[in-house]
Design a protein with these regions (language model features):
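Extreme N-terminal starter segment of soluble prokaryotic enzymes
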Residues: 24-27
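Glycine- and acidic-residue-enriched helix-capping/strand-helix junction motifs
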Residues: 37-52
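Short beta->alpha junction loops
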Residues: 68-76
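Short acidic/histidine-rich motifs immediately flanking catalytic phosphotransfer sites
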Residues: 85-92
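Short Gly/Thr/Asp-enriched flexible loops that form oxyanion-binding sites at enzyme active sites
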Residues: 103-113
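Short, acidic/small-residue loops that bind anionic groups at enzyme active sites
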Residues: 112-128
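Short, glycine-/small-residue-rich phosphate/pyrophosphate-handling segment
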Residues: 127-164
Length: 164
């Protein structure tokens, strides 16, 4: 009982005054090494906008979604976040940066959890250096979005909150 409202849990939904509200979706957005420099780093490739600024746009587009953002330049910290939220969130949007092409450990972490993930890259990694063409993460993800700039994050969130 909250005030004069009676709440009870029914199949992960909340009943309030006889109406059913769907549970709030929770999405984790993970950015890897050097992505803290968006807006400053190689603007011809990554653009002029910081990710923190762009995150406000995503939050405005999805007001009913809890977006949790985490960036780290350290592989173990990214793995810890996947472990922390990989069983109770509705989706993970991951741009592991250069770890995409080197980290079996992050791939194993994605494979060990039940939360679906979408891999995102701001630039078209297939049009860049050959060592960027292979992803260890892709086989562990529901999909991959590359080369669409920051919009790729929005598309990933949209997919993960859909019922597909």
């Amino acid at each position: 009982m909250i005030g004069d409202q009676t709440l009870c849990s029914v199949d992960e939904r909340t009943v309030r005054f006889g109406r059913i509200f769907a549970a709030v979706k929770k999405i984790l957005i993970l950015n890897g090494p050097n992505l803290n420099l968006l807006g400053k780093r190689e603007p011809t490739i990554y653009g002029n906008r910081s990710f923190v600024d762009y995150l406000k746009t995503i939050e405005a587009q999805f007001p009913d979604v809890q977006l949790h953002y985490f960036q780290s330049n350290h592989e173990g910290e990214l793995i810890d976040k996947i472990h922390e939220h990989g069983f109770d969130f509705d989706g993970i949007v991951i741009n592991a940066g250069a770890y995409t092409h080197t980290s079996i450990a992050i791939a194993d972490a994605l494979g060990a959890v039940t939360t679906p993930a979408v891999e995102v890259h701001i630039s078209n990694v297939h049009a860049r250096e050959s060592y960027r063409h292979h992803s260890y993460l892709s086989p562990k993800c529901k999909g991959v979005i590359v080369g669409l700039g920051l919009t790729g994050y929005e598309l990933a969130v949209r997919y993960l909150i859909s019922d597909e």
